Amino acid sequence: MRHRKSGRHLNRTSSHRKAMFKNMAASLFEHEVIKTTLPKAKELRRVAEPLITLAKVDSVANRRLAFARTRSKDAVGKLFSELGPRYQARPGGYVRILKCGFRSGDNAPMAYVELVDRPVAEAAE
């Protein structure tokens, strides 16, 4: 029985899941919007939101914790220089998940994962 067990296995080993979410979190922080399957998006939110909360207080210890969880210097740099200050007044809910239909190959539900309050480029006319 799996009562009270949190998290999805996503048909992967634990090491594969950890590596996948490290990479996905780093990509999310770098691009601020990524497209993935809906179950992965919902699990990514559980990884990304605590990292942004960590980035609100810029310290060497917090930077090391963030680097241990993403293994990306660029992601950590952006996290503490841009994203932490941007969400200073927000008490959580930094990630938005938007459903975007189904993948053509296997009909998997797809979703965009984006950071809220991200600067959107103006559409060129």
Swiss-Prot record:
- Please give the InterPro entries that the UniProt record associates with this protein: Ribosomal_bL17, Ribosomal_bL17_CS, Ribosomal_bL17_sf
The Gene Ontology biological process terms listed for this entry are: translation
One cellular component (GO) term of this entry: cytosolic large ribosomal subunit
Q: Which GO terms describe its molecular function?
A: structural constituent of ribosome
Q: Which residue windows are coiled coil? A: none
Q: Which UniProt keywords apply?
A: Ribonucleoprotein, Ribosomal protein
Q: Which HAMAP family does its entry note? A: Ribosomal_bL17
NCBIfam families membership: L17
Please give the family membership noted in the entry.
Answer: Belongs to the bacterial ribosomal protein bL17 family.
Quaternary structure (record):
Part of the 50S ribosomal subunit. Contacts protein L32.
The protein, known as: Large ribosomal subunit protein bL17
Q: Which organism is it from?
A: Marinomonas sp. (strain MWYL1)
Q: What lineage is on file?
A: Bacteria, Pseudomonadati, Pseudomonadota, Gammaproteobacteria, Oceanospirillales
Gene name as annotated: rplQ
